[in-house]
Amino acid sequence: MNEPLKPRVTFDDASPQEPLPQLRAGLAFDEQSGTPFSPISREEEVPEEGAAEEAISAALRPKRSLWRRMVMAGIGLFGVSALAQGVQSLHNAWIQQDWIALGGITAGSLIVAAGVGSLVVEWRRLYRLRERAEERDVARDLLHSHGVGRGREFCEKLARQAGLDSGHPAIQRWQASLHETHNDREVLELYARLVQPVLDTQARREISRSAAESTLMIAVSPLALVDMAFIAWRNLRLINRIAALYGIELGYFSRIRLFRLVLINIAFAGASELVREIGMDWMSQDLAARLSTRAAQGIGAGLLTARLGIKAMELCRPLPWLDDKPRLGDFRRELIGQVKETLQKGR
């Protein structure tokens, strides 16, 4: 029953030895030999969505050149000379009792005064638009502040600018939610959640309406000139209405400042007509294909109008976006649904 014992087996210790890692000589770094670098914050990065807007703004921004300064200096010198000549002519006409010349000089002075007054009004409106950017910076600081007292005064100022009195339901809900223990950040967050959406909803409604009208107009328009004129008119009207909603009265220069992105929209409308005509000759003369191509071009124009409206909201809105920034995809779904419904009714 007992099994015999197996003989002993002796193994040689011939396992390979792992080579020890070789240590490299130490390196000492100092400030002189090192390469200087500076960290890049995420705020400095330009998002892909706003790359086109940044490029157009940089292209349209006037360059501070020597020729520009010389022209401005010449215009200023000419204005001073004309004013001095007018005063001298007025004095001579009064002494010589030349009533006809005196009347002409007086009429010219009134016209010049009206022009200067218009320039002052335009400057004030442009300054109001720039002041809105400063208010956004103040609001951004208050959203990171733990102080007390500044937030409520700032929000009441924004409500007055937007034309919301103390009897408005949104203002009443906001005031009822306030507590004396709330700091500036909490007061501003309550305003952004209870009052600001009232204006944002109206602005979104205006954007949706203008985008839908642009889509349907481009879809049925046979002429590129009509497309361009209609889009320009609709976008001007959209900018004016959005600015008025947020309490900003636009002048000539401030309207141009907000209307820069319309250049993309107009250029797209003119080019889309050419692409559509070439595509029609290349594809077919079928009616269904023609309608689908026109609808696609209309959706593209409507999306660009919606993007212009979103940009106008960003420039006119007194508060920075928290988590409620409108997306282009929301308007895209609405436009596609409206175009599909229109095509089905047409059949």
Swiss-Prot record:
Keywords: Cell inner membrane, Cell membrane, Membrane, Transmembrane, Transmembrane helix. The chain crosses the membrane at residues 70-90, 100-120, 213-233. Its main location: membrane. It is a multi-pass membrane protein. Residues 1-11 have a biased composition (Basic and acidic residues). It is found in: Cell inner membrane. GO terms for cellular component: plasma membrane. It comes from the Bacteria. It holds the Pfam family DUF697. Residues 1-20, 30-49 are annotated as: Disordered. Belongs to the UPF0283 family. NCBIfam families: hyp_HI0043. This is UPF0283 membrane protein PC1_2326. It comes from Pectobacterium carotovorum subsp. carotovorum (strain PC1). The lineage of its organism: Bacteria, Pseudomonadati, Pseudomonadota, Gammaproteobacteria, Enterobacterales.
